[in-house]
């Protein structure tokens, strides 16, 4: 994914026009969110499980802390918690960088790049030719379970000339291939993003190498989609069960560059039907289609090849919407915490819901629990707890007109405040006093999401706190806000308060998170 804002920020850095940052003993490196070993990272690529190993590929500059020299970085894990850094998987070479794409298993060796005894794993990516700034689609393969990758000698598999009838930008805006095998039609499907045209194109192949255009999904064909949502990038597509029914539906997930609830880029998902050639979108509801109302959730993709015995659709995104501006010196960009994505009815509406994967419980320890306790205005709870890596869960019944506030990373003059305002059913994250916000005009302010009480009047909030981030999950996961924060080391306090009325705390669980 090539973002014009990123290019601008790279120039600012090259000119030495970076903003000052406060000193940090660990350079703000997260405790349990993935970061590259060093240098630049943007969105995840090619997420796939091979055997017992989860593979994370990501857009990476292995030589500098700014966007450029883009290749596929690589890390592996057996639990999605502890990551081992691996050598570059798909390198930039001969003036062609390796932009975003996806991976898939080729069990019947349709590509001919393995053999029947050892079928290959395939990775499709966008080749970005630096000299012309044009983009085409390319293929790499692995015959050693994803440890190493070889570029296909016949690249590109979709050239700019083949794209031309469907791309009015002359090869400048065709990228981020999502590829999967469509069981119903027996074909391989590729979904390409055309950011300059606000559309996706759908292609089919019998052998994963030779591709035929089939259809376009344009913004004008999606009933209810605002014309302000522009710059489509990083598509994903999959079937998702509708909880509580025997049905499944097709889902298209993508990252527009503009139009998100928090401003700028964000991730949305739409449901619809797919016949093997074209996707027909259901009418969208602007109040439920966005997967995150925070500023820092970009370029989400899902892991594939997850066994049916697991059954989860797990997604992750990059947490950074500010290019090279954040005040870190040895790294830029971090992965959101992996979360499950499901589709269910909440109240009277169908919602996408997300929850942190349960593996988080294996690396956390309870610090304090409360049950069936009423908090009143003037009280402060949890103030004895200190921590910069926490998992905080609060379930409560709010009085009419009350506002429950949870301050995290709290210090003498710093705090990030998560609030629930009962009168308008609003969940919010306030970064106004969160620490260093000078690095970007969008780094401060308040982000909000609608969160209704359940049928019994209960509100549930879960907050993942890390060195430089908060990720908030409201209700069953229908309201999510992910934001970067940059407080000082000493701002490690916690405070739970209420104003405007009481709140009955059904349960509170504060857990310390550590990979050690």
Curated annotation (Swiss-Prot):
Q: Which organism is it from?
A: Aspergillus niger (strain ATCC MYA-4892 / CBS 513.88 / FGSC A1513)
SUPFAM superfamilies attached to this UniProt entry = Arabinanase/levansucrase/invertase (SSF75005), Concanavalin A-like lectins/glucanases (SSF49899)
Designated name of the protein:
Extracellular endo-inulinase inuA
Catalysis: reaction(s): Endohydrolysis of (2->1)-beta-D-fructosidic linkages in inulin
Q: How is it used?
A: Plays an important role in biofuel production. Pure nonhydrolyzed inulin can be directly converted to ethanol in a simultaneous saccharification and fermentation process when combining A.niger and S.cerevisiae. Endoinulinase can digest fructooligosaccharides with high degree of polymerization (DP) values (>20) into short molecules that may be readily hydrolyzed by S.cerevisiae SUC2. Thus, introduction of an endoinulinase gene into S.cerevisiae will improve its inulin utilization and ethanol fermentation through collaboration between the heterologous endoinulinase and the invertase SUC2.
Q: What gene makes this protein?
A: inuA
- Mind listing the UniProt keywords for this protein, alphabetically? Carbohydrate metabolism, Glycoprotein, Glycosidase, Hydrolase, Polysaccharide degradation, Secreted, Signal
* Induction info: Expression is induced in presence of sucrose or inulin and controlled by the catabolite repressor creA and by the inulinolytic genes regulator inuR.
GO BP annotations listed: carbohydrate metabolic process; polysaccharide catabolic process; sucrose catabolic process
Give the residue range of the signal peptide: 1-23
User: Which SMART domains does the record cross-reference, listed alphabetically?
Assistant: Glyco_32 (SM00640)
């Amino acid at each position: 994914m090539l973002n014009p804002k990123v290019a601008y920020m790279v120039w600012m850095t090259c000119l030495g026009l970076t903003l000052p940052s406060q000193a940090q003993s660990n350079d703000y490196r997260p405790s349990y969110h993935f970061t590259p070993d060093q240098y630049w990272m943007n969105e995840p690529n090619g997420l796939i499980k091979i055997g017992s190993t989860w593979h994370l590929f990501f857009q990476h500059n292995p030589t500098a802390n700014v966007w450029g020299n883009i290749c596929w970085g690589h890390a592996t894990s057996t639990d999605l918690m502890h990551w081992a850094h691996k050598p570059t998987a798909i390198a930039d070479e001969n003036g062609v960088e390796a932009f975003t794409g996806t991976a898939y298993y080729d069990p019947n060796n349709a590509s001919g790049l393995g053999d029947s005894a050892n079928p290959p794993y395939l990775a499709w990516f966008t080749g970005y030719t630096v000299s012309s700034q044009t983009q085409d689609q390319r293929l790499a393969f692995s015959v050693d379970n994803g440890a190493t990758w070889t570029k296909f000698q016949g690249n590109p598999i979709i050239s700019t000339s083949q794209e031309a009838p469907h791309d009015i930008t002359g090869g400048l805006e065709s990228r981020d291939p999502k590829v999967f095998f469509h069981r119903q039609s027996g074909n391989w499907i590729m979904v390409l993003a055309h950011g300059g045209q606000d559309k996706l194109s759908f292609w089919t192949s019998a052998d994963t190498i030779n591709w035929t255009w089939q259809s376009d999904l344009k913004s004008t064909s999606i009933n209810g989609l605002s014309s302000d949502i522009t710059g489509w990038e990083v598509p994903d597509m999959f079937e998702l069960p509708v909880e509580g029914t025997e049905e499944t539906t097709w889902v298209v997930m993508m990252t527009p560059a503009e139009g998100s609830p928090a401003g700028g880029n964000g991730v949305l998902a739409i449901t619809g039907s797919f016949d093997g050639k074209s996707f027909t979108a259901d009418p969208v509801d602007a109040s439920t289609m966005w997967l995150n109302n925070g500023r820092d959730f970009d370029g989400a993709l899902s892991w594939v090849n997850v066994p049916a015995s697991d059954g989860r659709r797990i997604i992750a995104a990059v947490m950074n919407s500010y290019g090279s501006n954040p005040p870190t010196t040895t790294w830029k960009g971090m992965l959101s915490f992996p979360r499950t994505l499901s589709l269910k009815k909440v109240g009277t509406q169908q919602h996408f819901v997300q929850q942190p994967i349960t593996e988080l419980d294996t690396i956390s320890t309870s610090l304090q629990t409360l049950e069936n306790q009423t908090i009143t205005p003037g009280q402060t709870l949890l103030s004895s707890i200190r921590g910069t890596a926490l998992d905080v869960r609060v379930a409560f019944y709010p009085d009419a007109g009350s506002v429950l506030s949870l301050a995290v990373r709290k210090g003498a003059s710093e705090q990030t405040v998560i609030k629930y305002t009962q009168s308008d059913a609003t969940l919010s994250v306030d970064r106004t006093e969160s620490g260093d916000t000078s690095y970007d005009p969008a780094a401060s302010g308040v982000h909000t999401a609608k969160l209704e009480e359940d049928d019994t009047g209960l509100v549930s909030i879960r907050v993942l706190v890390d060195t430089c981030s908060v990720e908030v999950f409201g209700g069953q996961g229908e309201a999510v806000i992910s934001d970067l924060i940059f407080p000082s080391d000493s701002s490690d306090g916690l405070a739970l308060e209420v104003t405007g009325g009481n709140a009955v705390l059904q349960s509170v669980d504060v857990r310390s998170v550590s990979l050690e």
